[in-house]
Each structure stands twice: as C-alpha cells, then as structure tokens.
C-alpha cells in the first residue's frame, strides 16, 4: 500500500520541484486597452470660441495668447528623468587579544605551621617541579569597500492625478515598450510644483518631491538571470 502510494506521488513531486527551479516561461505582453480613467471620462463636446469685440485675447478654451502648461486634472506633463547615483564606502576593523596565565607554588601544599612539615613539602615540590601555565593569542582583521556608479536618462509622459490644496500636482505616468520579446517598464510618480514646469510643458525628475521611479525588464534575459521560486525557498532556509 505504501509502496503504491509512493510510486504514484513521486513523479508528481518531481515535476513540482523541477517547475519550481525554473522561472515563469510565459512571454510578456502589453495591454493596449485604454486606462480605466479614459473609459470613465465622458467624451468632450466641441465648444465654439467667442471673441469679444475689440479684444485680441479672445475667450473660450483656446485663446490666442495663453500659457499652455498643464494646469488641470488629466493634463499631460513630460517628465525628463535624469538620475545619477554615485556612492563609495569603505570600512576596516582590527581586533587582537593576548592572555597569559602562570600558576606556581608546586603540587603540594601544607596548611600547618610545623617548620619540619613545611620543609618536607618544599623539598617535594622541588623534586616534582610541577607548575601550570597557559598562553592564548587571538587576532581578527577585516576590510571591505564598495563603489557604485549608475545613471539613467529617459522621458516619460505623466498625467495630473490630483491638484493639491496648495496648488501642487500629484502626477503619475507609465510607459511600456516591447521589442524583440523584451519588455521594458518605466513608471514614475510624485508631487511637482506648477511653477517648475517650463514653457515646453516639461519638468525634470530632480524637481519632484516624493519621487518614485521604477524601471524593470521582462523577457528572456530576466528569465535567464532570475532564480526560480524553489531555489529561493531553499536558499532562504539553508543555514550555511
């Protein structure tokens, strides 16, 4: 009974174990469906512009002279991501310790006050010539250093999600690129000031507060370099 049970489940366990040691083999895809906020927004109705008599500025949504920077919710602003990271740190530690212990006095002692007994004990200790001594030395020295230099430059279009009470904008944007079965995902979010947006409706990522920038790839390269979930579990509990 037990043998039949093992023969039945052993292949299943082997398949599960081997599948855990490999990454997900599904190919990456891009969802071309419109975002949820686009579906929820009603279609815009055409509004005619009216011109005031004797005025060159005009009225309506497209006046002749106006600032075309992003100002409202769902307006688009271009974020120029230019991040450089440089770090260098080093450390060293050295510890040394030395102990020495010597015990003399011989192997025999006398608690009495008789001079003859004390003399005899002293002679015995001289003949035996016993004593105790120990020496211990330990030393530790460690040194390490790390240097990192990375740069990332690109542009992402983001939309204004919320206009805060103080006039600042919370923006969020995402870009996905699929080339030769390699998917690149760039996502950004943060708070910006409307005064930092230039006339070309652009803003630098260094002018963002609470900036969060995500860049990752999906595809064959990721599958080749990523560890399977079975390997991760084994390494998490492996004590050595």
Swiss-Prot record:
Q: Which GO terms describe its biological process?
A: bacterial-type flagellum-dependent cell motility
Q: Which GO cellular component terms are attached?
A: bacterial-type flagellum basal body, distal rod, L ring; cell outer membrane
List the InterPro entries.
Answer: Flag_Lring
Q: Which NCBIfam families match?
A: PRK00249.1-3
Q: Which family, according to UniProt?
A: Belongs to the FlgH family.
Per UniProt, subunit arrangement is: The basal body constitutes a major portion of the flagellar organelle and consists of four rings (L,P,S, and M) mounted on a central rod.
Please give the name of this protein.
Flagellar L-ring protein
State the encoding gene.
flgH
């Amino acid at each position: 009974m037990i043998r039949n049970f093992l023969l039945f489940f052993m292949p299943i366990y082997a398949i599960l174990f081997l599948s855990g040691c490999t990454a997900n083999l599904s190919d990456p895809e891009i969802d071309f469906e419109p975002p949820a906020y686009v579906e929820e927004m009603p279609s815009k109705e055409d509004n005619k512009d009216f011109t005031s008599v004797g005025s060159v500025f005009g009225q309506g949504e497209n006046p002749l002279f106006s600032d075309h920077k992003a100002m409202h919710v769902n307006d688009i602003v271009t974020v120029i991501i230019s991040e450089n990271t440089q770090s260098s740190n080093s450390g060293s530690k050295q510890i040394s310790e030395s102990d020495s212990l010597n015990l003399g006095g011989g192997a025999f002692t006398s608690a009495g006050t008789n001079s003859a007994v004390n003399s005899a004990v002293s002679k015995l200790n001289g003949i035996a010539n016993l004593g105790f001594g120990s020496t211990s030395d330990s030393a530790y020295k460690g040194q390490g250093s790390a240097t990192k230099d990375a740069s990332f430059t690109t542009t992402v279009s983001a939309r204004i999600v919320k206009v805060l009470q103080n006039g600042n904008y919370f923006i969020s944007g995402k870009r996905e690129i699929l080339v030769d079965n390699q998917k690149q995902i760039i996502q950004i979010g943060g708070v910006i000031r409307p005064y930092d947006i230039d006339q070309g409706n652009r803003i630098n990522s260094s002018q963002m507060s609470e900036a969060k920038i995500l860049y990752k790839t999906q595809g064959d390269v990721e599958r080749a370099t990523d560890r399977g979930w079975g390997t991760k579990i084994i390494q998490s509990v492996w004590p050595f």
